[in-house]
């Protein structure tokens, strides 16, 4: 429903001592470098910084394609390890190819050629229609300052290559809170939500004075598409690239991502994973980003275990018992 339980940026800092760097030693830093480090530490990257989402964005594209009726679960695709789009040879992360696979397997494998084909089926008009419908093109309206806007191609400038790269989450940027908010609309049955930290106003003695309300809109996508996407994303954990997001006793859905930072070929990446649970009736969703990891940089390897740990702690705290089927509305 948009209520934010936690929002964390690392490194953190002590509000009582904001000028002390909570990083490596600053003794050898110039004043300029120290100020840059402080500014970075103070920024709320979840809201104020944009990034290329990579394969976590495939949740948006998959839901759009299902809603538009341009793809069915049993549709088959072929991945030779790349796809030629105009004069570009755009590769899959599995350079030897996934071979023949269904649409569901394409999501499980996070296969770029499958999503380039799905994006082509959607077309530019449909793609931008659903980006608008799912809120990608606008700010979330979160109740904290400094929210950044999505940086997206102008529709009239999108050709086949741009459409292909957009389809697997590259060549544009958005904020983490924007992505998770839009994915939440897909998971919650199709209701547009406003992410928020504030729940109610209280008097000095703790008495509730006013319950805060936020804009919401139903039927952004169909409940059938929502249910189908939850099923597909649960299979990403049980059968696909999100196995390390598994939490014993819970049905977890997830989508991993690995995006290369600009400039390309700099060997700098953002590893990410979005996860939610219980998969059949979600009560909580989370997004983890690891900026410029050293060594292994795949989201399924290093970000998915963080999602697993988060959900393993959050679900019991929220009163969801292991093995329990949730029947109440998501909270």
Regions found by a protein language model. Give the residues of each.
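Ligand-recognition elements built from short beta-strands and adjacent flexible loops
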Residues: 309-331
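Short alpha-helix boundary/capping segments
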Residues: 221, 295-306
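Beta-lactam-recognizing serine transpeptidase/beta-lactamase-like catalytic domain environment
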Residues: 3-55, 60-290, 299, 320, ...
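Small/polar-residue-rich segments within soluble enzyme cores
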Residues: 288, 308-309
